[in-house]
Amino acid sequence: MSWSLRVDKPDTGESPFKHSLVTGAQEIPISSFADKTFTAPAQIRNFCIIAHIDHGKSTLADRMLQLTGVVDERSMRAQYLDRMDIERERGITIKAQNVRLSWSVTAGGTTENYVLHLIDTPGHVDFTYEVSRALEACEGAVLLVDAVQGIEAQTLANLYLALERDLTIIPVLNKIDLPAADPDRYAAEIAHIIGYESGDVLRVSGKTGEGVSDLLDEVVRRVPHPQGDPDAPTRAMIFDSVYDIYRGVVTYVRVVDGKISPRERIAMMSTGATYELLEVGIVSPEPKASAGLGVGEVGYLITGVKDVRQSKVGDTVTTVRYGATEPLTGYREPKPMVYSGLYPVDSSDYPSLRDALGKLQLNDAALTYEPETSVALGVGYRCGFLGLLHIDITRERLEREFDLDLISTSPNVVYRVVTEDNTEIVVTNPSDWPEGKIRTVYEPVVKITIIAPSEFIGTIMELCQSRRGELGGMDYLSPERVELRYIMPLGEIIFDFFDSLKSRTRGYASLDYEEAGEQEAQLVKVDILLQGEAVDAFSAIVHKDSASAYGNKMTNKLKELIPRQQFEVPVQAAIGSKVIARENIRAIRKDVLSKCYGGDITRKRKLLEKQKEGKKRMKTIGRVEVPQEAFVAALSADAAGDKDKK
C-alpha cells in the first residue's frame, strides 16, 4: 500500500494540485512499483471502462483504487475520480479522468508486477468526442453493463467506437449483488452482440468488491501491451486538458513513441506553438511529479499556459529538437451542435456573466460564445453547445459556481439558408433568418439508436414518425429487447424528444445519436407579435406543418402570462406578414361611473365616451411591458424539453 504524508483535503472538488505547491505540505509518497516511470511497455496495460450513466462505472473505479492500494481507507470517498460537485450529485462523469495503478499477478510460482492505466470516460451522448479520444489512449476496454437493466443505447454506441479502434473488449456484468439482477439473461445478450460465449462475461459487484481482483487479472491477461518505438521522435496524444487555478493548464497525454522529459521544449503539431515543460508527472490518483514518461505511459504535462484552447484534445505533442513530422491521426475540432442565448435576469450581471463564461471555456474547449442583444431580454451571449446535457450543465455551473441568475432562450440548431439570389446564410439564431424569398433551407440530421423493451415498438414508431423520423432499421437483441434506428432532424430531438420517449416507455428506453449530415427541409420562422410588434425572444424556426401548433401554444401561454392592460392587446403568431394564430388579452375596465350616484344619463354617457376615446388613444401609443417572470415562464416551459414536468 502506498502511504503519503500530506494535508488532508476536504471533499470540495478543489484543485488536486493545490497542496503540491505549499512547502512543507508537499506529498512525500512511500513508493510503490507504479511510482517509477519509464516502465517496460510489456508491463503496461492501458484500459478504459465503457458504461451507460448509472451502471456503476465510478463505483467500480473506486474498488480498483482500493484494491491496488493507491488510495488508503482514510482518504477514500465515493466516486473518487469525479472531482466536480455536479458530477457527484447527478451521478455522471463529465470530464475523463485517469489514474495509474500497480497490480501483481502470480502465475506458475512467479509474481510479475504490472502498471495499469485506468482512463475513466464520460457515458453521456453529448460527450462522445471525450470518449473517442480516451479510447485512443487505450488498448483495451471493459464493457460494463448493469445486471439489472442490461445494455443501453449509449453503451452500444461507445462499444462500436471501441471496436472501430480494434480495442480488446472485456465484457463485465456489474451489480450482481442486487436482488433484481438477472446476470444469465444479460450475459447471453452481451455475448450475442459482441460474438463471445456467455461464459466469457465476467461478473462483479462494484459495491461489495466481489470479482474485481479477477477483473484486474483478466485486464493483464487479455489486454495487449502498448506498441511503440522508444528511439523514434517523440509523439504523444493529448486526450484531455483541464484548467487548474494554481498551475494553469494541465494536459493529460499518452506517449506513443519516444519519451518526454521535464525542461524540454515541446511543440503542438496542430498549431506549431512551442512551450517549455515545467513538470511531467503521473496521476496515482493524486498528481506526482516524475522523471519523465516513456512509451505507452499515461501522465500529465504542465507548461504554464493559461488557456485550454492552446492544448487541444486529440492533438499530437512532440519535442522541438528531433521532433516528429507526422502527427497521430484522429484529431478534429469539437464543433457546437446546438445554440442557445444566455441572458442575466439582472442586466448589471452582464460583466460577471462574461467573466464566468471565459473561466468555463478554460476547462471546456467545446463551449463557444459571442455577445448578442435582444430587444426583450437586453444584452447576453449566444452560446454554442454539444447537446442538451451540455447546455444544462453549463447553465447549472454558471448559476452555482458564479452565483448568476440566468434566462436561457429556446435551443436552436444550425441551419443553412440559400436565398433567391444564391446567397448562403448560416443561421444559429431566429433573428438571423433572412427576410424575403428563400430558395432552400438545409437542416442537420442525426442517426438515432433507441433500445427499448419490444412491447413499446408501436408507441416509439408513432413518436419518431411524428418528429419526421425515417426508419433505418430494426434488430431484436433478444426476444424482449429491440434496437430501432432512425434518421431524424436534430431540431426535432433537442426540445422534448427524450422526455416524450421516456414517458411513453415508462423510462425503459435509452437513446443515442450521432451526426449524419444535412437534408432539405420546409422550415419557416414564426414570430410572436404583441400589439403588432415582434418580440425577438419568442421567435422560433419550425417545420411548416407544425408552425400553427407552435403559434397556438405560444399565444395561449402568453395570454395567461402577460398581465392585463388598460386596453385590449392582441397576441399574434405570424409567418412573415401572414397571421396564423391569435389570442386577445382582455382590457381591464375601470368603473368611471362609480362617482355618479344618480343624475342625468347624458353625464354618464359623456364619461363613457371620454373613456372610449382615451382607450383608443392608448391603443395607438401604448406599449405592452412584458414582465421578466413571463419571459422566464414562457421560455423555460418551452425550451429544453419542459424539464419542470419531469
From Swiss-Prot:
Q: What class of enzyme is it?
A: hydrolase
The record ties this protein, via SMART domains, to: EFG_C
Q: Which UniProt keywords apply?
A: Cell membrane, GTP-binding, Hydrolase, Membrane, Nucleotide-binding, Protein biosynthesis
Membrane topology per record: Peripheral membrane protein
Q: Which residues form the tr-type G domain?
A: 42-227
- Miscellaneous remark of the record: The overproduction of this protein is lethal to M.leprae.
Family (UniProt): Belongs to the TRAFAC class translation factor GTPase superfamily. Classic translation factor GTPase family. LepA subfamily.
The name of this protein is Elongation factor 4
Gene name, per UniProt, is lepA
